[in-house]
Amino acid sequence: MKPTRQSSIHCADCARAALRLPRNSGRALIWIYRHTLSPLVGFNCRHLPTCSVYGDEAIERFGLWGGGWMTLARLLRCQPWGTSGIDNVPATKPPGASWYRPWRYGRWRGVNAP
């Protein structure tokens, strides 16, 4: 039986959804944090946007691997002796960042510093 155009479109949608599964899983964990633990702890992030919004945007833009490293770097900077202020997710992938050098995704010091 010859595959029809309709079935090949359906297969493409399934493949696209499978590739987005890790990204959506990471975003789901952030959503759960926002709606369960965050209201109990209180809204007291030192940065704008908040760390959970930053993490959600970073994972949406760069995937679970790259966005997860960006979020880890942000969480490590969000402490009493860390940075504060406006710190947006970069619009493009940081220079030198690749899947085998994930620490290059994170901004480990400063706010909006390269």
From Swiss-Prot:
A Pfam family matched in the record: YidD
Membrane topology of this protein: Peripheral membrane protein
Keywords for the protein's UniProt record, in alphabetical order: Cell inner membrane, Cell membrane, Membrane
Cellular component terms per the entry's GO annotation: plasma membrane
Cellular location(s): Cell inner membrane
NCBIfam families for the chain: membrane protein insertion efficiency factor YidD
Family per similarity comment: Belongs to the UPF0161 family.
Record's function text: Could be involved in insertion of integral membrane proteins into the membrane.
Designated name of the protein: Putative membrane protein insertion efficiency factor
